[in-house]
């Protein structure tokens, strides 16, 4: 099959068994994507609660691993100390190890994959192959307003927003804009996300379902997510079953 050849799964039989078996057991293996400020955290809480999903955050897994004493820990610390990104192979291994501990449980993978190479690794892994891939779609200007309006109090650690949650007048002079909340940084992060999201979608044969969050309340977005999860899967069948050659 085309996908087995192109993405070279570690175990082709396990790959196929996982794909069809998860759907037969009605398991949710949800990948939730979205640009910075799209509201992934809010919707992840809704989904985890309603569908009893195990929440998987690659960032949290990396931080937890750094507090352990293992060969992987040493590798991660070495990359971090040099200011380098942790290789995809290590991140994928951490996710696979974590999923192995939760058995046949529904799970939500938060904000991953972020690149074409990560998507390819996810697709090639029988344990990580998702049943649903959903993107929370937001407008760049809305993200700039949402994140660019944040203000941080270095004394208390509290975060405010100049429009939605202004800081009290007595501390207004001491709140600051964090580096990640500068407009130029936000726009660059959005650009990188949008560029890579299209590549991720391509790896999964355009199986990413986008939910437009503009003008929608949190509850309305949650309802749309519920509708998507009412489907057995969003993954295009051509990922597993190759298209027949058309007769000339």
From Swiss-Prot:
Keywords of the record, alphabetical order, are: ATP-binding, Cytoplasm, Kinase, Nucleotide-binding, Transferase
Compartments, as annotated in UniProt:
Cytoplasm
According to UniProt, the name of this protein is Adenylate kinase
**EC code:** 2.7.4.3
First and last residue of the signal peptide: none
Instruction: Tell me what organism the protein belongs to.
Output: Giardia intestinalis (Giardia lamblia)
Recorded family membership: Belongs to the adenylate kinase family.
Which reaction(s) does its UniProt entry say it catalyses?
Answer: AMP + ATP = 2 ADP
How is this protein organized at the quaternary level?
Answer: Monomer.
Q: Which GO terms describe its molecular function?
A: adenylate kinase activity; ATP binding
- Give the primary localization class: cytoplasm
